[in-house]
Amino acid sequence: VLGGTGAMGTHLVSILAEAGMKVDVTSRQELADRTNIHYIKGNVHNISFVKSLLAQNYYNVIIDFMIYTTVEFNDRYWLYLNNTDQYFYLSTSRVYADAALITEESPRLLDVTTDKKYLATDEYALCKARQEDLLRNSCKSNFTIIRPYKTYSEIRLQLGALDKETFIQRILQGHSAVIPMDVMSHTTTLTYARDVAICIAKLIGNKKAMGDTFNIVTSKNIKWMDVLDIYLNVLENKMGYRPN
């Protein structure tokens, strides 16, 4: 599991280990091994580290939570496809263009936008779509593309584009938090990271998942203002007063 110490990765690693699988996890930090889990310290952005890792081991499954530039991914996706039975690429539901109903077949921004200035960038939604295309055009089919959206977990809380370190930490330190109110009226989905991890685990070794794409997102939606109210209610209960 590449970069498997985040919100989704932490849950997925535990699920796989509890199922009796031997799991290697890359991390930038030195972490203690646990039952069926071996942590390997290294920088996956360093392709020499990746080559060394794959030269020493053959993995039945590679699950990739890393965020690459398109140039970086172009240099390594063949390494992954050629050194595993099934490669999981974590994309994002942000690749989609606006639509009333979004499915895996819905148009992506990359496919429909005519904004040349935007297309000249490697913005997150574009780079993920381009990297999906590299896999699809590879003439290989031993990959599975996962498109989650906003997730939350014991180590991740989000509010629009803000992470907990930006707003909750400030509040707990006694400071006011600046919240972009224009975002608060927007609707989102928030999926528990463990639910995403459970779905990914069920796709491992599934031949029908090869070469396919899966949105793993809750069907329930919520306004960011309501999410903010939930956070404020919990903080008020903890702190004894309602934060600003």
Q: What is the predicted function of each stretch?
A:
Residues 2, 153, 180-186, 214-222, ...:
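Glycine-rich Rossmann NAD(P)(H)-binding loop
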Residues 33-46, 66-68:
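Rossmann-fold cofactor-recognition segment
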Residues 91, 132-157:
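Conserved beta-loop-beta element that borders a ligand/cofactor-binding pocket
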Residues 53, 57-115, 129-132:
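NAD(P)-cofactor binding segment of oxidoreductase domains
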Residues 159-168, 180-205, 211-212, 226-229:
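Substrate-positioning beta->alpha
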Residues 1-19:
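N-terminal Rossmann NAD(P)H-binding glycine-rich loop of SDR-like oxidoreductase domains
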Residues 202-244:
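Mid/C-terminal beta-alpha module of Rossmann-like enzyme folds, strongest
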Residues 102-132, 161, 189-190, 221, ...:
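Short-chain dehydrogenase/reductase
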